[in-house]
Amino acid sequence: MSRIGKRPVTVPSGVTATVEGQTVRMKGPKGQLEFVVHNDVEVKLENGAVKVAPRYETNRAQALYGTARAQVANLVAGVTKGFEKKLEIVGVGYRAALQGKTLQLALGYSHDVSYAIPEGITIAVPKPTEITIAGNDAQRVGQVAAEIRGYRPPEPYKGKGVKYADEFIFRKEGKKK
């Protein structure tokens, strides 16, 4: 079994890390993030690295400390590089456009879908069939991408809909006569 939690998360130069109780805060060039670690997990800042260890020898604590370490690593990646997801829109007449703080989506419905862009997330539309979502919080970037994809998920017959750029859509054959 992999024990990813045993490896400490190194804090690069230009990033300040603070640990207060169960709260880990990271501040870097892309902003500030914080994460509250579960009580079953012990978190310490030692020698410029954040170390995570299970507080108890229970299965729950063993499972949670690897997750906590991955979350702390995502904080470091978020404040240094940030995160980005790309969506593609496939279908005749399907397109996206930015209007101020809202994303307008024409997805084959009788009306356009308006999506209010949340704080801390930037959305770019390089082409009418491409959407780029960026931010420093991995969870929020993924959540926004999933919400936009949820308006018209790709269907298996023609592949029409909103899909992730690296997503493969399993295609089905239509019914035969």
Curated annotation (Swiss-Prot):
<dbReference type="InterPro" id="IPR036789">
    <property type="entry name" value="Ribosomal_uL6-like_a/b-dom_sf"/>
</dbReference>
<comment type="similarity">
    <text>Belongs to the universal ribosomal protein uL6 family.</text>
</comment>
<dbReference type="GO" id="GO:0003735">
    <property type="term" value="F:structural constituent of ribosome"/>
</dbReference>
<dbReference type="InterPro" id="IPR019906">
    <property type="entry name" value="Ribosomal_uL6_bac-type"/>
</dbReference>
<dbReference type="GO" id="GO:0002181">
    <property type="term" value="P:cytoplasmic translation"/>
</dbReference>
<keyword id="KW-0699">rRNA-binding</keyword>
<dbReference type="InterPro" id="IPR020040">
    <property type="entry name" value="Ribosomal_uL6_a/b-dom"/>
</dbReference>
<dbReference type="InterPro" id="IPR002358">
    <property type="entry name" value="Ribosomal_uL6_CS"/>
</dbReference>
<dbReference type="InterPro" id="IPR000702">
    <property type="entry name" value="Ribosomal_uL6-like"/>
</dbReference>
<keyword id="KW-0694">RNA-binding</keyword>
<dbReference type="GO" id="GO:0019843">
    <property type="term" value="F:rRNA binding"/>
</dbReference>
<comment type="function">
    <text>This protein binds to the 23S rRNA, and is important in its secondary structure. It is located near the subunit interface in the base of the L7/L12 stalk, and near the tRNA binding site of the peptidyltransferase center.</text>
</comment>
<protein>
    <recommendedName>
        <fullName>Large ribosomal subunit protein uL6</fullName>
    </recommendedName>
</protein>
<keyword id="KW-0689">Ribosomal protein</keyword>
<keyword id="KW-0687">Ribonucleoprotein</keyword>
<comment type="subunit">
    <text>Part of the 50S ribosomal subunit.</text>
</comment>
<dbReference type="GO" id="GO:0022625">
    <property type="term" value="C:cytosolic large ribosomal subunit"/>
</dbReference>
<dbReference type="Pfam" id="PF00347">
    <property type="entry name" value="Ribosomal_L6"/>
</dbReference>
